[in-house]
């Protein structure tokens, strides 16, 4: 299972700076979907061969009252469920009462914790960090997150216990690796492997949108409520099922619930459990509450699913019992705020009464089939050439970018690898045009599609051009001319 790293600390110690550095993406087409919220608190990270989820907990001010407030509840839950906690402090400001309070809480939880003294640039780091040893949480790691100093070493050290599970052999400093990109043969093997496995479906959404009700409706039985007991909060529940001859595994992120009153069951929402479920799924079913419309939390979950490359279906729940005026307003909001994912099917359902639930699986199968359908190299190359014929690549330094051929580089999500000359200099607008061209040509529905560009080898790169004898003579004459003029 992919490890989760939680960033903990009082405000203004650099959590967001480190979060942004860790979750940066090299391909704007993966993360830069217009319309997505920019204020993300969780994301996927790839660094030095490690893949992990990073969570900016926020919401903890270090005071005893603050830790017990509703605002801090989600942050504390994230700390509980994280595999590694990075406790960030400000080396310039020194040790504060808030730091001591947070450290006391972390010690009581016995989490794998690393103390990070941030903002060490321009100061005597050893002297500034000495007092943080008194927190009693072990070694203090120095970092300047804004400049990137110490970030890679910190992550490597913190995630070393997970290296074997990820198949990573540590051999000193490494650059970031490109995720999930295969050769043509490896991509074909991956596609065959996916075809033999059941479809993993993660049902996600913010609290109380009807995830549990929909899960029960799909399974056709009333699930037993699972109470909070030690050891039950870490993982989602995996439920195998068969429908119309096809095997599924439902990943139930709402499986753990707590009873607050005798007759009332309140769903316990866990961000980390949801993120892990998305990582492990083939298809994500995002539930939106029709009565509340598209919330920022919906967009955050949607963004994570897209960045993970998962096939996607959206269900607008509680559609029954609302008047036509509200329905029209909700549809208008969906068009406005979710227009950037026009490839995903949207269904209007009632999980409670079962209205529209049956049609969900048609879209789930369609999305999965699109995400895992094999496409030949000849077909992909032909589509690439057609896109060039319709709209030529721009000139770069007076030369036309030349695209040579394309092949499959992975599935779920579908990855198309395009080889050519100067492809690294293609503007994002042309890359986005090509991505949409491939989507239309392949009739891809319900899944994001990713393009990777690989530069062709240039045999003349880094070679000094050797002059002919006549060119050498002209060069000498020109140089002597210049010297005479200076005299």
From Swiss-Prot:
Protein family: Belongs to the TRAFAC class TrmE-Era-EngA-EngB-Septin-like GTPase superfamily. EngA (Der) GTPase family.
Function description: GTPase that plays an essential role in the late steps of ribosome biogenesis.
Binding positions (GTP 2): 205-212, 252-256, 317-320
Gene Ontology MF term list: GTP binding; ribosome binding
Summary of subunit composition and partner proteins: Associates with the 50S ribosomal subunit.
Keyword Cell division found: no
Record protein name field: GTPase Der
Keywords: GTP-binding, Nucleotide-binding, Repeat, Ribosome biogenesis
Keyword Nucleotide-binding in record: yes
Chain sites annotated for binding GTP 1: 9-16, 56-60, 118-121
